[in-house]
Each structure stands twice: as C-alpha cells, then as structure tokens.
Amino acid sequence: MNMEDLVEQIYDKRSKEYFLESYSSYQNSFYRSAIVTLWNLVICDVFFKLEKLHDTYDDSVAGEILDKFIKLMKQNNPTNWELNLLEEISSRIHLIDSIELEKFKHLQKLRHLSAHPIIEKDN
C-alpha cells in the first residue's frame, strides 16, 4: 500500500491536514519540522478522537479525560500534560497500547530535540 492510500484512511479531516503538513516537510527534507508537526498531529488527533467518543457515543471517561486536559492547557500548566494525556488514554480507555505509548514517548523526545536543539560549546 502506498502513502496516498494510507492517507485516505485517515478518518478526521483535521488530522489528515496535519499529517499532510508533516509528510510534506519530510518529503522536502525538513526533518525537524516533520517531527514537530507529527507530534502536534498525535496530540491533536487524540483530542479529536476523545471528542468523537464523548459526543457520538456519550463516553463519560473520554469526556472526563478531555475536561481534565483542556483545563490544564488553559492554565498553561508547564507539567508534561501531553505525555500524561497519552498515558491516560492508554490506561483508561485503551486507545493505544503500551508499545504505541513507548513509541509516542520516543517521538516526544525527538520533538523536544527538534524544537529545542541543544547547542554545545565545543560543537
């Protein structure tokens, strides 16, 4: 299956747009940008899925998780809310499994390195 076929399988229009932005960055060799936008896609897509679960299926746990993290975002809480969000959807509603969670943790580390590069004096 080629990439275009895979892109068509992305259900949410907003998520598809985020993915296409990330993929475009990758195709143009803007790798740091691709990583940052891919991380943004992951977090936004989780919110979109939680909204869908809550609004369409009246999933109260999804609603609780949404409310909790929306409040944290509005408070501009410097805690690691993004990773906490992923851990919560993994443990409470099993939207992702433990292997995917570890991959997302790694992606977050890459995102931080891409968005906030470390400059050493000797290099």
At which residue positions do the language-model features occur?
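Charged alpha-helical initiation segments
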Residues: 1-37
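A ubiquitous short alpha-helical element
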Residues: 2-8, 69-74, 94-100
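Alpha-helix N-cap/helix-start motif at coil-to-helix transitions, marked by capping-box chemistry
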Residues: 9, 13, 80, 101-108
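Short runs of predominantly hydrophobic/aromatic residues within well-ordered alpha helices
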Residues: 19, 31-39, 82, 86, ...
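Short, charge-rich amphipathic alpha-helical segments embedded
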Residues: 31, 36, 41-61
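Feature for intrinsically disordered/low-complexity regulatory segments and propeptides
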Residues: 50, 59-92
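Charge-enriched, short contiguous segments at helix-coil
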Residues: 93-123
